[in-house]
C-alpha cells in the first residue's frame, strides 16, 4: 500500500524470488516462488523477496534526502494504519505494539544505517510488534478501502440512531482508495486460487485473506491470519 501511494510500485512491477532476497551481504530467506512475480501473486503467496524490494524502494525514494527520512515516512504510514499506537479500545492496558522511530536506529547504529540494515521490517519482523487487535483493525482498513472506526467493546445495539456520533467517526489513512482494490485482489487470490490461504476458502463467499508468521523466541513460530468477507462489500 505504501509503495503504491509513494509511486515506487505499480501492480505490474515484477521481482524475482530465487528463495529469498540478497543484497549487500544481507540475506532474507523465502520459498521458491515462480518468478518473476507481480504484486498480485506476491500477496497471494506471501513472497518475502518481493516486499523486501518494495521496502527498499520506499526508503531509497529520491524525493527523500536519505533512507532515514524515507523510513520515517514509511513509519508515519504504518502509524496511520494503527500500528505502534493505541487504537483506543475500552480496555485498560491496551498495548501499543512497536514500530521504532529513526532515532532508535540512529542510537543503535550510531547514525550509520540504511534500508538493508532494517530490511527485516519489510516483512513485519525485526523491531515490529503488533497486537491481534491491530491486525484485525488493519483487515478492517483494507475491507473499508482506507478507513477504520475506533474499536469498542459493546453490550448491544438498539438501533443505528442510538450510536453516538463519536463512535461513528471514521479515521482515514493517507492511501488512495484505488490502491486498496489492488491489495484486495491479491488477498482474494491467496484464498481462492493459488495462494497460502486456501484453507480459508468457503463456497459462495468471496473470502479475502493474508497469512503471516509471528516469531516466537521460546519455541516454534506461530501462524497468523487476517481476513474479511465478502471481498466486494
Where are these regions (language model features)?
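Beta-lactam-recognizing serine transpeptidase/beta-lactamase-like catalytic domain environment
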Residues: 2-233
